[in-house]
């Protein structure tokens, strides 16, 4: 899949994918996405699906997380993180936490992500929900200076 801001592809669907570094997480699908500089992809939300994201150290992505879970102990909490930027780490995004990303780099940014549900276009089975990119305010995507 390709759009004005980049591309997305499914790399693999798995029947069993248990990683010792991710307790309680069984990978069912591996995805790869590229984003052009300055592009924002937001907000996605999943009812049951957990995402695990990896951004290569050579890239720099601003990730915004919003807790919109019903009955959450941290309702409407917002968190901004930088992934990549010389560091290697995984980000685990639980169900019900809206998430989006902005490529802060000068070249195409890459995300490899694992999910514990396989994509389905069937409206009764899909895990793909959306909120507007500016749901938390357009300024959430501004780069903090200082």
Model-inferred region functions:
Residues 86-92, 97-105:
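Beta-rich strand-turn-strand
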Residues 1-86, 104-146:
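Non-catalytic, conserved peripheral segments adjacent to functional cores
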């Amino acid at each position: 899949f390709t759009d004005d801001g980049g591309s997305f592809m499914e790399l693999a669907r798995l029947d069993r994918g248990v990683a010792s570094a991710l307790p309680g997480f069984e990978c069912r699908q591996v995805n790869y996405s590229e984003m052009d500089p300055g592009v924002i992809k937001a907000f996605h939300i999943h009812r049951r699906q957990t995402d695990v994201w990896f951004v290569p150290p050579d890239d720099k992505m601003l990730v915004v997380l919003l807790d919109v879970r019903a009955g959450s102990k941290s309702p409407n909490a917002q968190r901004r993180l930088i992934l990549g930027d010389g560091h290697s780490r995984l980000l685990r995004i639980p169900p019900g936490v809206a998430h989006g990303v902005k490529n802060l780099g000068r070249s195409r940014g890459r995300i490899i992500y694992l999910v514990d549900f396989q994509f389905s276009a069937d409206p009764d089975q899909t895990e793909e929900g959306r909120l507007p990119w500016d749901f938390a305010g357009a300024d959430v995507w501004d780069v903090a200076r200082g």
